[in-house]
């Protein structure tokens, strides 16, 4: 039986410095750094939709990439994402990707 051994550590961001050094760090580190940067720029301004903002920033490229990978096969995409196909269809519609 096939056993999946990929973990969230496989989700990395690769960067190249000005000295052509290549570094990889977990996606979560990049998300955390982006959030810290965003919060620092608020200058005390209230925000009430941060969860939705972050979710949209991650969810839309996730959907786009998975749909390309599965060549538009919604059943396969939903299975890969671990969600119901109906839920996938709603998310695709939300982002105008249907």
Curated annotation (Swiss-Prot):
GO terms for molecular function: DNA-binding transcription factor activity; sequence-specific DNA binding. Keywords: Activator, DNA-binding, Transcription, Transcription regulation. It comes from the Bacteria. InterPro entries: Fis_DNA-bd (IPR005412), Homeodomain-like_sf (IPR009057), HTH_Fis (IPR002197), Trans_regulatory_Fis (IPR050207). Activates ribosomal RNA transcription. Plays a direct role in upstream activation of rRNA promoters. Belongs to the transcriptional regulatory Fis family. This is DNA-binding protein Fis. Residues 74-93 bind DNA. Gene3D superfamilies: Homeodomain-like. The keyword Transcription regulation applies. Homodimer. The keyword Transcription applies. The gene is fis.
């Amino acid at each position: 039986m096939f056993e999946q051994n990929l973990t969230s550590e496989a989700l990395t961001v690769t960067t190249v410095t000005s000295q052509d050094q290549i570094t990889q760090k977990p996606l979560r580190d990049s998300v955390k750094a982006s959030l810290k940067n965003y919060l620092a720029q608020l200058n005390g301004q209230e925000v009430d939709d941060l969860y939705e903002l972050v979710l949209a920033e991650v969810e839309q490229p996730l959907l786009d990439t998975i749909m390309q990978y599965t060549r538009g096969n919604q059943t396969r995409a939903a299975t890969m994402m671990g969600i119901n196909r109906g839920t996938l269809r709603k998310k695709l519609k939300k982002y105008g990707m249907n």
